[in-house]
A protein has these predicted regions:
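Short, solvent-exposed secondary-structure boundary motifs
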Residues: 20-23, 72-80, 201-211
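Envelope-exposed proteins and targeting segments
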Residues: 34-36, 82-84, 98-100, 211, ...
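Short, low-complexity, Pro/Ser/Thr/Gly-rich segments in the mature regions of secreted, periplasmic
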Residues: 303-313
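Hydrophobic membrane-insertion alpha-helices, especially the h-region
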Residues: 8-21
């Protein structure tokens, strides 16, 4: 009798386990996918600094390895901004295991180039560029001064030209300060280029209101295509849904669709935002999560899973 009871208990446990895994690995519907979706805002700016405490801040790094949008106060810098999609994700398919982790696409890869730049060489190139810009502005300034001398306030367009001349004067003033700081940095011979990234996600809470929270980057794949973000308090919203990556390959991407913040309903991958979830059609109007859209292609679910299980960044 005791043996029969043990066998019955074991049988019930097996049924419960099978039911759980079937439920957990069941394809996703649009409502669940929308609950997993977040919008990611990425802001980035750069800081040049030397050992004597001199600092300059810049909005972006261009393709010529030169910094744009200079400011000498951090509060005045205007960060570059990008918007992508992202989604909550479980660390394992065995059980709910999202500790505030989000997968998203890399919005800008200029940091790869920035990591290879030598600080002192960047200062030298930046100094030459700033001097050329200043010379060009001074030429405009001289022409505008001449115009304002030979024309009066009563002349048509005088006020517009005067306003433009004032803007040029302010730009010259800014460049003179930037050049002075760059010259000081060049003398120190030890300059660092720091990158500052700010990630903020937006999602709807249980009341349907938009909430925002800051995140840290904990992983980035070697090809600089996708990131794993984590909320600073490791919080996963109670009303959200975390995507589960199934433990088998999904190679057939035919009839795949994307779920994105851009549209209410699934759309073709081409029209979705980078960071959107990709699904392959299954049955009963459901889909199997199969990958993430990038700015140039997509990553499949196994590539995402590989990154999820790497060690976190320090």
């Amino acid at each position: 009798m005791r043996k029969k009871g043990l066998l019955l208990g074991f049988f019930v446990l097996c049924l419960v386990a099978i039911a759980w895994f079937v439920y957990h690995l069941w394809p996703t519907d649009t409502t669940q996918a929308k609950r997993a979706l977040v919008q990611v805002q990425h802001q980035r700016y750069y800081q040049l600094s030397d050992t004597k405490g001199n600092k300059l801040f810049f909005s972006s790094l261009n393709s010529d390895s030169l910094l744009e949008g200079a400011a000498w106060n951090e509060r005045d810098v205007r960060p570059s901004k990008w918007i992508t999609d992202g989604f909550w994700v479980n660390k394992t398919w065995l059980y709910p295991s999202c500790n505030g982790e989000i997968v998203t696409a890399v919005s800008d890869s200029s940091h790869v180039m920035a990591n290879k730049l030598e600080g002192i060489l960047l200062v030298s190139n930046q100094l030459n560029k700033s001097k050329r810009q200043l010379n060009g502005l001074k030429h405009q300034q001289n022409e505008l001064r001449y115009y304002l001398r030979v024309h009066g306030v009563q002349d048509m367009g005088y006020n517009i030209v005067a306003g433009y001349a004032n803007d040029i004067h302010l730009q010259c003033d800014t460049l003179n300060k930037v050049i002075a700081l760059l010259q000081l940095m060049k003398k120190s011979q030890k300059v660092r280029l720091l990158r500052k990234d700010i990630f903020t996600i937006s999602y709807k809470n249980a009341e349907g209101k938009v909430e925002k929270t800051h995140c840290n980057v904990i992983r980035e794949d070697a090809n600089h295509k996708i990131l794993i973000l984590k909320t600073k308090d490791s919080r996963f919203p109670s009303n959200a849904y975390a995507m589960t990556i199934v433990p088998w390959n999904i190679d057939d991407m035919n009839e795949s669709m994307a779920v994105t913040t851009r549209f209410r309903q699934p759309c073709t991958i081409e029209f979705a935002h980078p960071g959107s979830m990709i699904f392959v059609s299954t049955y009963m109007h459901k889909g199997r999560f199969s990958g993430i859209k990038l700015s140039d292609g997509y990553y499949n679910s196994r590539q995402i899973d590989k990154l999820i299980h790497l060690e976190e960044k320090n």
